[in-house]
């Protein structure tokens, strides 16, 4: 970039400067550091951080520690129906292992997602369970739990409907939660890594997951191996606030990294795999 270009970049109004940042980040193979962006645009790192924060909220780039990376294909929020046909065997195994952690008389929280829905299905199948209260903000999960009524009491949080996930979010989603002291929350996300913990691609869903987890004495993350090593826009729960991860289809290295960070990992399909997790071919 020439001296003239630097001068022009430094004097750009915020929208044009942010467009330039997106262009630089999208053209890079990996992380673009804040300092490099500041130098390229002829502006301060403080200004670049403010721009990155705004662009992250708009889901135009993904902010990470030290800079930004372009949005990958996995950073697009996908409909529940689309994700429901992926990793079905792994999700069913996770559901059964997670359901084994529940005892009669407990209050359980299930958030939105196809893996929590698998937990719901496994809970219903456990005919030994009685007097279980399940709190959820997922219409899909609530319907999956209906066959267990009256053995189970199913509480739907209320809130504002998001059709993409058939979920209930703020405003009003959190109104009932201060009255609930749950034993365990089973929470999912779109990413799980050591640096950020559990993350999710959508901010309203992230906030809902946060609020649900906060009602419970224990947080159990349910995530198949495809979620490991990914970080998305919203931080749901840092690793230090996660009690257990229940997974299937994860590599040995991925499981080892989470365990090394001090989090218990339950491998639901008998043991870590040496090959990367792949999509389940069963529709």
Identify what each model region corresponds to.
Residues 2-35, 42-45, 57, 90, ...:
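Conserved phosphate- and dinucleotide-binding cores of soluble alpha/beta proteins
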Residues 119-120, 231:
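Short, Lys/Arg- and Gly-enriched loop/turn segments at beta-strand edges
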Residues 112, 116, 138:
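Conserved SAM/SAH-binding loop
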Residues 130-132, 245:
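Conserved helix-loop-beta element of the AMP-binding
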Residues 132-133, 154:
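Rossmann-fold dehydrogenase core element
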Residues 2-35, 39-112, 120-129, 147-151:
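HTH-adjacent hinge/linker in prokaryotic transcriptional regulators
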């Amino acid at each position: 970039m020439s001296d003239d270009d630097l001068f022009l970049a430094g004097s750009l109004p915020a929208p044009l400067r942010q467009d330039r940042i997106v262009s630089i980040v999208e053209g890079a193979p990996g992380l673009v550091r804040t300092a490099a962006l500041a130098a390229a645009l002829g502006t301060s790192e403080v200004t670049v951080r403010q721009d990155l924060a705004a662009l992250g909220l708009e889901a135009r780039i993904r902010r990470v520690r030290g800079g930004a990376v372009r949005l990958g294909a996995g950073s697009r929020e996908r409909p529940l129906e689309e994700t429901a046909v992926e990793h079905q065997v792994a999700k069913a195994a996770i559901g059964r292992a997670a359901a084994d952690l529940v005892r009669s008389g407990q209050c359980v929280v299930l958030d939105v997602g196809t893996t929590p829905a698998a937990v719901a299905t496994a809970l219903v199948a456990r005919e030994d369970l009685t007097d279980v209260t399940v709190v959820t903000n997922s219409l899909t999960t609530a319907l999956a739990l209906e066959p267990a009524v009256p053995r189970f009491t199913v509480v739907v949080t209320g809130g504002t409907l998001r059709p993409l996930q058939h979920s209930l979010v703020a405003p009003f989603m959190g109104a009932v939660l201060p009255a609930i002291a749950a034993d365990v929350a089973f929470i999912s996300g779109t990413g799980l890594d050591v640096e950020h913990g559990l993350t999710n691609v959508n901010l309203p869903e992230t906030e809902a997951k946060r609020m649900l987890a906060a009602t419970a004495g224990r947080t159990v993350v349910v995530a198949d191996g495809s979620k490991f090593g990914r970080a998305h826009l919203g931080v749901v729960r840092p690793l230090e606030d996660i009690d257990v991860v229940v997974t299937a289809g994860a590599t040995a290295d991925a499981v080892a990294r989470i365990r090394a960070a001090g989090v218990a990992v339950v491998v639901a399909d008998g043991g870590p795999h040496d090959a990367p997790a792949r999509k389940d071919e069963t529709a």
